[in-house]
């Protein structure tokens, strides 16, 4: 996916921490939490092609302390001014919230201090269909259910070619591959016949409709304070 987006391999780093384990890791920072699916518990298995050594390479333990240490090392190595991360108040996915928390802890630990967060939301607390409408359409602001910090917005336009590139990059994500369950596919056929709804040809997963739009939407948070 990164290489499709023009990011060279030498700037891609695999960390290898396990899905849906970040909140538990944050609650017990020194305890290792392995994969729920494969029972694997050594993050080094995916790191053999990384361009630099990281703190967790020493013991391979999937702990919160190792994650924060890895992120701090990456900050000091690449020295980014801007970081892209899930919105911790808007996106309720537990791993997304915890990943931004880990990033904030890493910034506090690191000698390098980025200046800006660009934050996005893949999910909402009360509505997983946002943004509404077809792929290629615009993105409206999410419903204002709870008060949020007063962040600025940035909404860059995407050309048709860039939208296709984004869809192709998404198609390389293993959890977005494959067809829909029969019940969901049947519901789509009914919606298509009765309401004229259409889904993108690039992928059947709902994320292809939600994520590939004619512009992006980021909340911009100043970290300089």
Segments and roles (model prediction):
Residues 1-14:
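Glycine-rich phosphate-binding loop and adjoining beta1-alpha1-beta2 segment
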């Amino acid at each position: 996916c990164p290489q499709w987006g023009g990011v060279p391999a030498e700037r891609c780093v695999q960390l290898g921490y396990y899905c849906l384990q970040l909140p538990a890791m944050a609650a017990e920072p020194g305890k290792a939490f392995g994969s729920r699916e494969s029972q694997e518990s050594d993050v080094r298995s995916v790191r053999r092609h990384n361009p630099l050594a990281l703190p967790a390479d020493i013991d391979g333990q999937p702990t919160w302390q190792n994650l924060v240490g890895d992120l701090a090392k990456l900050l000091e190595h690449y020295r980014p001014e801007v970081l892209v991360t899930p919105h911790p108040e808007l996106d309720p996915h537990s791993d997304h919230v915890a990943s931004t928390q880990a990033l904030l802890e890493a910034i506090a630990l690191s000698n390098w201090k980025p200046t800006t967060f660009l934050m996005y939301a893949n999910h909402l607390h009360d509505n997983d269909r946002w943004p509404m409408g077809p792929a290629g359409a615009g993105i409206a602001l999410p419903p204002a259910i709870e008060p949020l910090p007063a962040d600025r917005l940035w909404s860059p336009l995407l050309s048709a070619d860039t939208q296709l590139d984004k869809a192709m990059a998404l198609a390389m994500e293993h959890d977005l591959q494959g067809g829909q369950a029969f019940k969901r596919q049947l519901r789509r056929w009914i919606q298509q016949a009765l309401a004229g709804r259409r889904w993108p040809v690039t992928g059947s997963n709902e994320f292809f409709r939600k994520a590939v739009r004619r512009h992006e939407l980021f909340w911009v948070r100043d970290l300089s304070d």
